[in-house]
Protein backbone atom coordinates (compact mmCIF):
# COMPACT_ATOMS: atom_id res chain seq x y z
CA UNK A 1 0.00 0.00 0.00
CA UNK A 2 1.55 3.28 -1.09
CA UNK A 3 1.69 6.42 1.03
CA UNK A 4 0.37 9.73 -0.21
CA UNK A 5 2.19 13.01 0.26
CA UNK A 6 0.25 16.11 -0.70
CA UNK A 7 1.96 19.46 -1.11
CA UNK A 8 0.01 22.70 -1.30
CA UNK A 9 1.08 26.09 -2.56
CA UNK A 10 2.02 28.68 0.07
CA UNK A 11 1.83 32.47 -0.25
CA UNK A 12 5.03 34.08 -1.42
CA UNK A 13 6.73 36.41 0.99
CA UNK A 14 6.75 39.76 -0.76
CA UNK A 15 8.38 42.62 1.08
CA UNK A 16 8.31 44.86 -2.00
CA UNK A 17 4.81 46.15 -1.20
CA UNK A 18 5.87 47.78 2.07
CA UNK A 19 6.04 51.57 1.76
CA UNK A 20 7.76 53.22 4.76
CA UNK A 21 6.10 56.58 4.06
CA UNK A 22 2.64 55.03 4.14
CA UNK A 23 3.56 53.06 7.25
CA UNK A 24 4.83 56.20 8.97
CA UNK A 25 1.66 58.15 8.20
CA UNK A 26 -0.44 55.30 9.61
CA UNK A 27 1.77 55.12 12.72
CA UNK A 28 1.41 58.85 13.36
CA UNK A 29 -2.31 58.64 12.69
CA UNK A 30 -2.66 56.00 15.39
CA UNK A 31 -0.13 57.11 18.00
CA UNK A 32 0.79 60.70 17.12
CA UNK A 33 -1.35 62.35 19.80
CA UNK A 34 0.33 60.24 22.48
CA UNK A 35 3.92 60.81 21.38
CA UNK A 36 6.34 63.05 23.23
CA UNK A 37 10.09 63.16 23.76
CA UNK A 38 9.73 61.28 27.05
CA UNK A 39 8.15 58.32 25.28
CA UNK A 40 10.90 58.38 22.64
CA UNK A 41 13.59 58.55 25.32
CA UNK A 42 12.22 55.49 27.12
CA UNK A 43 11.94 53.59 23.84
CA UNK A 44 15.50 54.14 22.63
CA UNK A 45 17.02 53.47 26.05
CA UNK A 46 15.11 50.18 26.27
CA UNK A 47 15.03 49.06 22.64
CA UNK A 48 17.74 46.44 23.09
CA UNK A 49 16.01 45.09 26.20
CA UNK A 50 12.67 44.96 24.36
CA UNK A 51 14.31 42.99 21.55
CA UNK A 52 15.57 40.43 24.08
CA UNK A 53 12.08 40.15 25.61
CA UNK A 54 10.53 39.50 22.20
CA UNK A 55 13.22 36.91 21.44
CA UNK A 56 12.03 34.91 24.47
CA UNK A 57 8.29 35.46 24.02
CA UNK A 58 6.34 32.85 22.03
CA UNK A 59 3.56 35.23 20.98
CA UNK A 60 3.15 36.50 17.41
CA UNK A 61 1.83 39.85 18.64
CA UNK A 62 2.97 41.59 21.82
CA UNK A 63 1.95 44.77 23.63
CA UNK A 64 4.94 46.85 24.69
CA UNK A 65 4.58 49.95 26.86
CA UNK A 66 7.12 52.77 26.65
CA UNK A 67 6.68 55.88 28.76
CA UNK A 68 3.08 55.00 29.51
CA UNK A 69 2.06 54.45 25.89
CA UNK A 70 1.12 50.93 24.77
CA UNK A 71 2.22 49.81 21.31
CA UNK A 72 1.14 46.56 19.68
CA UNK A 73 4.05 45.08 17.73
CA UNK A 74 4.48 42.03 15.52
CA UNK A 75 7.05 39.74 17.12
CA UNK A 76 9.58 38.79 14.45
CA UNK A 77 12.36 38.20 16.98
CA UNK A 78 11.16 34.91 18.46
CA UNK A 79 13.19 32.24 16.56
CA UNK A 80 10.16 30.42 15.14
CA UNK A 81 8.63 33.72 13.93
CA UNK A 82 11.65 35.24 12.20
CA UNK A 83 10.53 34.19 8.71
CA UNK A 84 6.85 35.01 9.21
CA UNK A 85 5.49 37.56 6.70
CA UNK A 86 4.86 40.96 8.29
CA UNK A 87 1.78 42.87 7.06
CA UNK A 88 2.52 46.25 5.50
CA UNK A 89 0.44 48.07 8.11
CA UNK A 90 1.95 46.21 11.08
CA UNK A 91 4.52 47.62 13.48
CA UNK A 92 7.72 45.75 14.28
CA UNK A 93 10.32 46.93 16.79
CA UNK A 94 12.56 47.92 13.87
CA UNK A 95 9.84 49.87 12.08
CA UNK A 96 8.81 51.57 15.30
CA UNK A 97 12.39 52.68 15.87
CA UNK A 98 12.52 54.23 12.41
CA UNK A 99 9.11 55.86 12.79
CA UNK A 100 10.02 57.42 16.14
CA UNK A 101 13.35 58.69 14.81
CA UNK A 102 11.52 60.22 11.83
CA UNK A 103 8.94 61.82 14.14
CA UNK A 104 11.70 63.36 16.26
CA UNK A 105 13.49 64.64 13.13
CA UNK A 106 10.32 66.18 11.71
CA UNK A 107 9.56 67.82 15.06
CA UNK A 108 13.09 69.21 15.41
CA UNK A 109 13.11 70.50 11.84
CA UNK A 110 9.97 72.52 12.49
CA UNK A 111 11.11 74.17 15.73
CA UNK A 112 14.44 75.24 17.21
CA UNK A 113 12.86 75.11 20.66
CA UNK A 114 11.77 71.51 20.06
CA UNK A 115 15.29 70.66 18.89
CA UNK A 116 16.70 71.98 22.17
CA UNK A 117 14.08 70.04 24.10
CA UNK A 118 14.81 66.82 22.21
CA UNK A 119 18.57 67.11 22.63
CA UNK A 120 18.11 67.54 26.38
CA UNK A 121 16.02 64.38 26.74
CA UNK A 122 16.66 61.82 24.02
CA UNK A 123 19.70 59.56 24.04
CA UNK A 124 20.64 57.40 21.06
CA UNK A 125 22.90 54.72 22.59
CA UNK A 126 24.69 53.61 19.39
CA UNK A 127 25.40 57.22 18.41
CA UNK A 128 26.87 57.95 21.83
CA UNK A 129 29.22 54.99 21.74
CA UNK A 130 30.47 56.04 18.33
CA UNK A 131 31.29 59.52 19.59
CA UNK A 132 28.31 61.24 17.94
CA UNK A 133 26.29 63.82 19.88
CA UNK A 134 23.40 66.15 19.15
CA UNK A 135 26.03 68.82 18.42
CA UNK A 136 26.91 66.90 15.25
CA UNK A 137 23.42 67.60 13.91
CA UNK A 138 20.12 65.89 14.54
CA UNK A 139 20.07 64.08 11.19
CA UNK A 140 23.39 62.38 11.92
CA UNK A 141 22.57 61.65 15.56
CA UNK A 142 19.12 60.22 14.83
CA UNK A 143 20.49 58.49 11.74
CA UNK A 144 22.02 55.91 14.09
CA UNK A 145 18.55 54.67 15.04
CA UNK A 146 17.67 51.22 13.69
CA UNK A 147 15.05 51.71 11.00
CA UNK A 148 16.25 55.20 10.08
CA UNK A 149 17.41 53.74 6.75
CA UNK A 150 13.74 53.73 5.68
CA UNK A 151 13.93 57.53 5.42
CA UNK A 152 17.23 58.39 3.74
CA UNK A 153 16.01 61.82 2.67
CA UNK A 154 14.88 62.81 6.17
CA UNK A 155 18.30 61.82 7.55
CA UNK A 156 20.52 63.17 4.75
CA UNK A 157 21.92 59.74 3.81
CA UNK A 158 23.46 59.28 7.26
CA UNK A 159 21.88 55.84 7.89
CA UNK A 160 23.55 54.66 4.66
CA UNK A 161 27.03 55.98 5.39
CA UNK A 162 26.85 54.90 9.04
CA UNK A 163 26.41 51.33 7.82
CA UNK A 164 29.35 51.83 5.44
CA UNK A 165 31.56 52.81 8.38
CA UNK A 166 30.29 49.84 10.40
CA UNK A 167 31.41 47.57 7.58
CA UNK A 168 34.80 49.28 7.30
CA UNK A 169 35.55 49.81 11.00
CA UNK A 170 33.49 47.24 12.90
CA UNK A 171 33.84 44.39 10.40
CA UNK A 172 30.07 44.23 10.02
CA UNK A 173 29.00 41.79 7.31
CA UNK A 174 28.37 43.81 4.15
CA UNK A 175 25.28 41.68 3.52
CA UNK A 176 23.53 43.67 6.25
CA UNK A 177 23.62 46.62 3.85
CA UNK A 178 21.21 44.98 1.42
CA UNK A 179 18.20 46.62 3.08
CA UNK A 180 19.54 50.18 3.01
CA UNK A 181 20.72 49.77 -0.58
CA UNK A 182 17.14 49.07 -1.64
CA UNK A 183 15.63 52.16 -0.03
CA UNK A 184 14.28 55.21 -1.82
CA UNK A 185 15.55 58.74 -1.32
CA UNK A 186 12.33 60.70 -1.49
CA UNK A 187 10.86 59.80 -4.87
CA UNK A 188 14.19 58.54 -6.24
CA UNK A 189 14.81 54.81 -6.55
CA UNK A 190 18.01 53.28 -5.21
CA UNK A 191 19.36 52.97 -8.75
CA UNK A 192 18.77 56.69 -9.27
CA UNK A 193 20.28 58.06 -6.07
CA UNK A 194 23.31 55.77 -6.34
CA UNK A 195 24.32 57.67 -9.47
CA UNK A 196 22.78 61.11 -8.94
CA UNK A 197 23.54 61.77 -5.27
CA UNK A 198 27.19 60.72 -5.05
CA UNK A 199 28.35 64.18 -3.95
CA UNK A 200 25.88 64.31 -1.05
CA UNK A 201 26.67 60.74 -0.02
CA UNK A 202 30.42 61.39 -0.01
CA UNK A 203 29.91 64.52 2.10
CA UNK A 204 27.87 62.55 4.64
CA UNK A 205 30.45 59.74 4.58
CA UNK A 206 33.27 62.17 5.32
CA UNK A 207 31.30 63.82 8.14
CA UNK A 208 30.75 60.49 9.89
CA UNK A 209 34.42 59.72 9.29
CA UNK A 210 35.31 62.57 11.66
CA UNK A 211 33.71 60.77 14.62
CA UNK A 212 35.92 59.03 17.18
CA UNK A 213 34.07 55.80 16.36
CA UNK A 214 34.98 53.69 19.35
CA UNK A 215 34.17 50.03 19.35
CA UNK A 216 30.77 49.28 20.89
CA UNK A 217 30.73 49.39 24.67
CA UNK A 218 33.15 52.29 25.16
CA UNK A 219 31.72 55.72 25.90
CA UNK A 220 33.67 58.90 25.01
CA UNK A 221 34.50 59.33 28.71
CA UNK A 222 35.82 55.76 28.91
CA UNK A 223 38.00 56.30 25.84
CA UNK A 224 39.46 59.49 27.29
CA UNK A 225 40.18 57.71 30.57
CA UNK A 226 41.96 54.80 28.88
CA UNK A 227 44.04 57.14 26.72
CA UNK A 228 45.72 58.40 29.90
CA UNK A 229 47.18 54.93 30.26
CA UNK A 230 48.26 54.62 26.64
CA UNK A 231 45.23 52.56 25.58
CA UNK A 232 43.81 54.01 22.38
CA UNK A 233 40.53 52.59 21.09
Curated annotation (Swiss-Prot):
Entries under InterPro entries matching the protein: Bunya_nucleocap (IPR001784), Bunya_nucleocap_C (IPR043011), Bunya_nucleocap_N (IPR043012)
Any coiled-coil regions, as ranges: none
One CC-aspect GO term: ribonucleoprotein complex
Result, substituting residue 48 to E: 99% loss of RNA binding and RNA replication activities
Alphabetized UniProt keyword annotations: Ribonucleoprotein, RNA-binding, Viral nucleoprotein, Virion
Gene3D superfamilies documented for this protein: 1.20.142.20, Bunyavirus nucleocapsid (N) protein, C-terminal domain (1.10.472.180)
Keyword RNA-binding: yes
Main location group: virion
Binding residue positions for RNA: 12, 15-16, 48, 51, 77, 95, 166, 178-179, 182, 184
Localization, UniProt: Virion
MF terms in GO: RNA binding
Chain's role: Encapsidates the genome, protecting it from nucleases. The encapsidated genomic RNA is termed the nucleocapsid (NC) and serves as template for transcription and replication. The NC have a helical organization.
Family in the record: Belongs to the orthobunyavirus nucleocapsid protein family.
Assembly, per entry: Homotetramer. Binds the viral genomic RNA.
Free-text note regarding domains: The N-terminus and C-terminus are involved in homooligomerization and play an essential role in viral RNA synthesis.
Record-given protein name: Nucleoprotein
Lineage of the species this protein comes from: Viruses, Riboviria, Orthornavirae, Negarnaviricota, Polyploviricotina
